[in-house]
């Protein structure tokens, strides 16, 4: 088999634009992955930039005869796998031997035909305000109210999708007719082929929605700018789409607009209980993936799979985590839960539309509980909540508010269930006829969502010693969140014993295997290096002579150094910062001192900003944490990367605080240092993206030259030449032309 792996790999690389140059690191990785899969051993692979690590694991996966799930942290990598790498593998193999593949998204990335029917003309969804953290409309007419919006927290919780972003991303039809089985991307479910344009359910979507009154929005969403206009455009698209994949839309709907016509897997009652279930886009996607050999998903989706007890993805033998340095953070987030007042209010509002007026008091009681919870959470904003403070016998304000919300939500859910029993599930709560089953479907969804809310509220009252609770105040109103302190024990029980795992990244954080709970006796670790000539093509400059950051002279000295470096580079600079304040201060100080265009994060959306930087070789881009990873600007547009300081994690991060408490005296080296080293390496890695790239990385933090822990940080960086001389750095840059 190892020989087959090398032969197939050679056949694929010979067709690449690079002309088929052999990559020893890629071949070493492919052989190691092949051995790991055949022997059932876990493997952690550090594969530096330029290795071609995706083919290094996809080729042995394709030849293994096993069902393999590949989990990635970014949409860009998913697109690369589905649009380039997997089709190349399919084309290189004989018909009948090539693997089929699908790229899966979460259920909420697909149009829900039932919700679309309810929100369309003749639909019965109530008008609800948007949830916590979601703006109602950015001031555009028609944005004030969302028809039938059960609120994003209620519908989408537990299915985050950073790879796609809240604005949705991913791609449809990834794969290949025939051998490569088309699919969907990025978040959740697989599917079966439908083979034609679909018609919508009979609840009114068969005709064009032209009046805002049809949506219960007194609104003008002219040109699709308002929420009403966006929903109308989505419903128009719904009549012609074959996949229901949000990525097919010709515009980017707001989270609120898309939430009106979608649903998360957690809150979907299932196709067999849904009037539109036999036409469900998400179920078809899931069936298609179940028939595929290789399934590409978002890492958050894999976390949701684990959190659900394995109910999300099809059975599989092997899981590959690309961008493995993200796994710990993603799993920490995915295996947690959260409760906010917006989620509670949404449940009450939706329930009110389903219950007879005699039950309004139950909905009102839940709304009152939501307001009380908001008030109780306020003093805790941004702080950890000790587990005992939420116990049922605690009489503090927060514990009392949680208990009150729990009791009242339970009562409301019981009323909904009883209403369904009385109606014989054929009429809605007001006694109106329900021939299409729309009211029943809404009640089923609301009961399910209410049950999940009860579960999460119960969880809050019984937080274990291995969990951390805190109040997140980043949204419109505070939210109580719970996460595991360490994910290793959970993964050691629920994941690693079940299937072979391959974890790979250009930067594998120190101690990653241990923190993820990988069994040492069944796990191998290798580093296949990088084919790039860092020693001759790149220089690491550490500004050892800069004054201490607390000094009044620090900002001026940093600006002087940056201006000198940028001048020597002829622009072509990506300046990375650890805070918005530092970024704006540096931009203001440097802008008038350089004769080059200076772009600042926030001037444009990230894709447009990156493209503007890439297209003009004399442009500088100043950016914060969102640009430390995943930004690829090869060639002459980038010759200098500056990093304002070592990117240590925030001291007030609740999960990391809990980990520090647990680690005791070793907290800095076991908690903070590995994360700083990984992010520093990611930032440094923005410079050399191809074998011909050259330039300087300038770290404007003297601690990298003087601190006792500098060796741990330097040891994870590519083997560049190093200097503490500004003259050496400017001379290197000047010599690039």
Give the location of each predicted region.
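A substrate-engagement module of RecA-like helicase motors
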Residues: 2-13, 66-67, 72-293, 425-432
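Signature of the SF2 helicase/ATPase Hel1-core->accessory helical subdomain module
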Residues: 63, 76-79, 87, 265-410, ...
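Conserved RecA-like P-loop NTPase helicase motor core
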Residues: 543-553, 603-705
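Conserved helicase motor "Helicase C" RecA-like lobe of SF1/SF2 P-loop NTPases
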Residues: 578-602
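Conserved pre-motif I regulatory segment
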Residues: 2-44
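A contiguous, basic/glycine-rich beta-loop/short-helix subdomain that forms a polymer-engagement track
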Residues: 259-293, 308-310, 412-424, 428, ...
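Walker A/P-loop
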Residues: 38-57
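Conserved RecA-like ASCE P-loop NTPase motor core of nucleic-acid helicases/translocases
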Residues: 68-74, 503, 572-578, 699-700
